[in-house]
Amino acid sequence: VSMGRAFKVQTEAVRWSHDEAAFDAWREGRTGFPIVDAGMRQLLAEGWMHNRLRMITAMFLSKDLLIDWRWGERHFMRHLIDGDLASNNGGWQWSASTGTDAQPYFRVFNPTTQGKRFDPEGAFIRRFVPELEALDARRIHEPAAHGLFAPEEYPRPMVDHAAARD
């Protein structure tokens, strides 16, 4: 384990995006994907998030936005009250498919499906994304699909997950 270095050396050749505006949207919980936004806002508010959320948000940054996983690794270490080099680095490399026991590069969590599976009623999302608190369980995971918000109220999804996955 080495902070900022991929275990799989061949993955150092990946051309990561260095889109600071997209990184800021992810970091601040303004991606348009409610479960991602709730997790990132929890991190900023409490300095912690459940491991499932760490995987969802890390995979979203590295595989949906194609932003260098090291940016996320550093951000987590700055904010996690339980931040640990080995655990954090291993989690990021697992999510970005650059580590020893990494997910295959084609394994990408669907943030909408993950939200529906692990927060089916949307209680966690409502807690950290108050803009969505009035939505029922059917709509809270995909507010843009229901045409419920103007972008200044809650952002539209910043990427098309299906297209980003390909």
Model regions and ranges:
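C-terminal catalytic domain of photolyase/cryptochrome flavoproteins
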Residues: 1-166
